[in-house]
């Protein structure tokens, strides 16, 4: 990394609500430039597919790993994060509270001053360790969504304020005390690394040509990466309910993916019929159809990597789902144009964007505002298009 950790300093006076919201808007409006500025702080770290998505070498397999070969482990003992957004190091990113003093957390400030439509502190899975280069294994424990947001979005806010103060020039860790205490963003046990399962959906036509889906995330509706393109579906890895039994039963990337396919592509609700807090997947027709397609080989699902966004610390498990065209057309004949988080991108009246070198360069080469993980996933899928589409 480019600088040593910053020494503690006295916090400036608390920002007023308008000034604080202005920096938050800057994070969305200048996200790509801020991602680049954040990535430059970690110039010695590996990147995913030449993008700004940070990784460790063991997170990048040589080729696609069948989802069935990824083992998920569970730890009931979660280490206390060494870095969080509590205490004096975070005071400078917390605005003044109407009740006096500062807000006590970043999410409390968001809820009161800049709440998006979707902003809930749900039970989530926190990633503790990962390897995808040998026997693939991901180990999780219990956490909550705000545990990740409080740090990730606070360090993004801190960097945006410093970047604005420099006139859009380089920033250094010496002026970023909250980020400086973090250390290596890929050291998962030092923070609450709540993960997203981010999926590139490919429709494979006879002959091998493919197309993909793209989502535009509405900044009025989502807290993370509003105003950007993203592959779809993508969603936080979490159980369907907070019931203790559901937490263990839903520790499944596939179950999470099927829910996201339903919600993002078909506009399905996030609330599911449950008994005892658990969803009976075997009684859900859509789940049965998707699972049958996997078993028949007309849907192939692979994990191709894992990475960390340098700006917000968002941590994404990168997957690819390749559907035979006939299966895709049958399962998603009700493909929506809009959903709870934004809209499905269309070109020339079609949601099917050709999976070509030109399209990958457009959406993963800096020409369009694409979320960092989505850009990395597009590039990885293009690199691995032979085994993925063969």
How would you describe each model-predicted region?
Residues 269-296, 317:
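Acidic, glycine-rich loop-and-strand cores that form catalytic or ligand-binding grooves
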Residues 314-319, 325, 329-383:
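NUDIX/MutT-family hydrolases
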Residues 133, 175, 208, 297, ...:
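Intrinsic-disorder/low-complexity loop/linker signature
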Residues 142-145, 235-239, 252, 347-363:
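Short, solvent-exposed coil/turn linker segments
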Residues 200, 207-281:
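Conserved Nudix-box catalytic region and its N-terminal flanking loop in Nudix hydrolases
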Residues 198, 230, 318-320:
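Generic structural signal for residues positioned in beta-strands
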Residues 2-228, 363-390:
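Alpha-helical and coiled-coil interaction segments, frequently adjacent to or embedded
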Residues 289-329:
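Active-site-adjacent beta-strand/loop module that shapes the phosphate/pyrophosphate-binding cleft
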């Amino acid at each position: 990394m480019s600088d040593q950790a910053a020494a503690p300093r006295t916090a400036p006076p608390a920002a007023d609500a308008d000034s604080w919201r202005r920096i938050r808007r800057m994070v969305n409006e200048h996200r790509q430039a801020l991602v680049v500025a954040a990535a430059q702080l970690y110039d010695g770290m590996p990147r995913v597919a030449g993008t700004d998505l940070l990784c460790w070498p063991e997170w990048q397999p040589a080729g696609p790993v069948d989802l069935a070969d990824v083992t998920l482990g569970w730890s009931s003992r979660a280490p206390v994060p060494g870095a969080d957004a509590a205490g004096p190091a975070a005071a400078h990113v917390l605005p003044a509270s109407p009740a006096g003093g500062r807000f006590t957390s970043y999410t409390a400030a968001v809820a009161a001053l800049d709440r998006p439509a979707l902003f809930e502190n749900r039970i989530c899975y926190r990633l503790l360790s990962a390897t995808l280069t040998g026997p693939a294994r991901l180990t999780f424990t219990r956490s909550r969504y705000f545990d990740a947001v409080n740090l990730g979005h606070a360090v993004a806010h801190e960097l945006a304020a410093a970047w604005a103060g420099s006139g859009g020039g380089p920033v250094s860790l010496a002026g970023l005390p909250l980020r400086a205490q973090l250390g290596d963003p890929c050291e998962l046990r030092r923070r609450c690394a709540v993960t997203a399962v981010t999926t590139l959906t490919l429709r494979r036509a006879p002959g091998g040509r493919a197309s993909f889906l793209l989502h535009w995330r509405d900044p009025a509706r989502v807290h993370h990466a509003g105003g950007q393109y993203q592959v779809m579906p993508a969603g936080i890895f979490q159980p369907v309910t907070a019931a203790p039994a559901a937490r263990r039963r839903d520790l499944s990337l596939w179950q999470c993916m099927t829910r996201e396919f339903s919600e993002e592509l078909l506009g399905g609700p996030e609330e599911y019929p449950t008994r005892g807090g658990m969803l009976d997947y075997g009684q859900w027709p859509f789940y049965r159809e998707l699972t049958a397609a996997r078993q028949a080989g007309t849907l192939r699902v692979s994990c191709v990597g894992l990475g960390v966004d340098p700006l917000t610390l968002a941590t994404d498990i990168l997957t690819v789902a390749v559907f035979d065209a006939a299966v895709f057309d049958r399962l998603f004949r009700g493909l929506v144009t809009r959903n709870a988080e934004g809209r499905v991108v269309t070109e020339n009246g079609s949601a099917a964007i050709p999976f070509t070198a030109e399209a990958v360069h457009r959406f993963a080469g800096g020409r369009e505002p694409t979320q960092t993980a989505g850009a990395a996933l597009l590039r990885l899928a293009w690199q691995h298009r032979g085994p993925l589409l063969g």
